[in-house]
Amino acid sequence: PDLYARTYKFLEPKDYLNLKLTGKFASAQDAIALHWVTDNRDLNRVYYHPALIKASGVDQKKLPDLYSSTDVLGAILPEAARDLGISADCKVVLGTPDVQSAAIGSGAVDDFAAHLYIGTSSWLTCHVPFKKTSPEYNMATIPSAIPGRYLIGNEHETAGYCLTYLRDKVFYPKDAITPEGAPPDAYQRFNDLAASVPAGSEKLIFTPWLIGERTPVEDHTIRGGFFNMSLSTTRAHMVRAVFEGVAYNSRWLLEAVEDFAGRKIKALNIIGGGARSDLWCQIHADILNCEVRQVKDAVQANVRGVGLLAGVSLGKFRFKDISSRVAIQKSYQPNPAHRKIYDELYAEFKNVYQAHKDIHKRMNKTH
């Protein structure tokens, strides 16, 4: 209560930085959306909704004024320019949060053009010209940085983190067997191991729900595991199964996004740390049965996105020009030879969830 009473404004991290740069308290409609205090059903008139403000318990006077992500907030303060060593003539654009900036940096900015992010977590989304909520899939549209457009909001809790878990808790923990811990090239070794195993990992299935799942099912008690292990299962099989299990989960989400959007997605741009693996890109193309376009400098998609947003805001180019400004390093087509095994195992992947969800609910009911 004391902290609340002493607080003048509640700001998102980027909005605090903008305050230091310009002296202005401001937030963008897309950034404030996940505070659940705005009515964004009409993107031309986003405002703090009285009922939502009341439910939040926060005084509206403690919230910043609302703008568009593309608005120029103003010139940088002289002291900020001096501290940063940049020109005092620099303009400060309001900017956009993590997911929205990645969407722009992926180059998938047209309506229904999709991108897949594989990092610690993952998501698969596209811009759409409508607002919609799906309790079935635990998905809803959120305002994007592009005026008049929404993004389909969803998330997988653990994607690339499954490999981190494998590295730090299974293969290379600092214990009596591997006291030195993981080598610097651990992920490349994983990639090489996975490539040595045929598609389908000899029918070993990994489910990546290490801390539950959000979409296309909201289930905080489900947990991950390896299924169908045998005496012939090697750690190479386990590594490839992790690559494939994350991709099965991506396909599950893709199907939900397609149903939500009302159309098939035939190609998607892939970004994030996982996109640096050629093998993982190909596995995704095979399992999702669609073209996967590996964005160049995929890890920098978020930074590129805010840079491109600034370019639009300052009139250097238009949103429709962005896709041609984002380079595609390589395109991956589905391998028809892998279609049968991956379709079979994907069906069983979903069956594993149905067969085990009640068991996990009982086992993890206190979590």
Question: Each predicted region: which residue ranges?
Answer:
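Short glycine-aspartate micro-motif
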Residues: F10, D89-G105, A113-Y117, W123-L124, ...
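Short acidic, glycine/serine/threonine-rich loops at helix termini
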Residues: L21-A26, A31, N40, I76-E79, ...
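Short acidic loop-to-helix transition motifs that present clustered carboxylates
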Residues: S68-A75, P97-S101, A275-S277, Q300-N302
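Glycine-rich beta-strand-to-loop/alpha-helix junction loops that act as flexible
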Residues: S69-T70, I118-S121, A267-A275
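Gly/Ser/Thr-rich active-site cleft segment
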Residues: P1-P97, L163, T207-I211, V239, ...
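Conserved glycosyltransferase catalytic-site signature
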Residues: K14-D15, T96-S101, S121, H284, ...
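Glycine/Thr-rich phosphate-binding loops that ligate phosphate moieties of nucleotide
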Residues: D2-T7, L11, C126-H367
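Short, acidic/turn-prone active-site loops that include or flank metal/cofactor-
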Residues: I32, T120-S122, K296-Q300
